[in-house]
Amino acid sequence: LLLTPQISLMFRTKSAQLDSIYTCHLLYTVRLRKPEQGYREFDGPGRDLMEKALALRIRLDAMIKGKETRDRLIAASGGAIRELLDLVSQSAFAAAGDEIRLSDVERAVGKRKQRMRDLINANGWINELVRLSREKQISSDQKCMDILFHRLAFKYNGEGCYDIHPLVAEIPEFERAVGESQSALSSA
C-alpha cells in the first residue's frame, strides 16, 4: 500500500505516530530550476525527468506535440507529478481534438490560478506566501502549514528548500505584494 499524504501532515505533532506505525518515505517535488531563477526557467535534469514520467502515462508524442506546450505544462506543475497529471487532464478536457495545444493548457492553467487566487484571498495567505518565496523555508505559522496542505508551496529535492507553486507567482495580488515587500525592504 502506497499513500501520499500532504507534506504538512508530516510536520504536525499529532502525526509523529505515523513513523512508528508505517515506514514513511517523503517524495519531494522535482527541482526544475535554481531558487534564484524565474518560475518558467529550467535548470538541471528535472524538466526531462518530468517529461519522461509523463510519457509513461500518456502517448506524449501524439497528445502533446509542441515543446512550448510541454514546457508550459511542466513549468506550471512546479515539478509535482500530481500537479502535472491534473493539468494534463484538465487540458485534455479543454482540447477540441486528440491533441493538447498551448491554448488548452493556458485555459486549464487559468482555471487553476483562479482557484488558487480565491483560496489565497479567502484565507489571507498572501503575506506568508511572499515570505516563503523570499526565504525558501517554512515557518511554524499555521498559515504556512495550510499553504503546504493545499499544495501552494512545495519542498524540493536536493538542498531541501521550499518554494511557492509557480502559478502563485502569476497571481496579481502576489505580484503586487512582492513589489510592496521589496519596496519596504529597500527603504528600511
Residue ranges, per PLM feature:
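C-terminal alpha-helical "lid" subdomain
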Residues: 60-188
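The catalytic "switch" region of P-loop NTPases
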Residues: 1-67
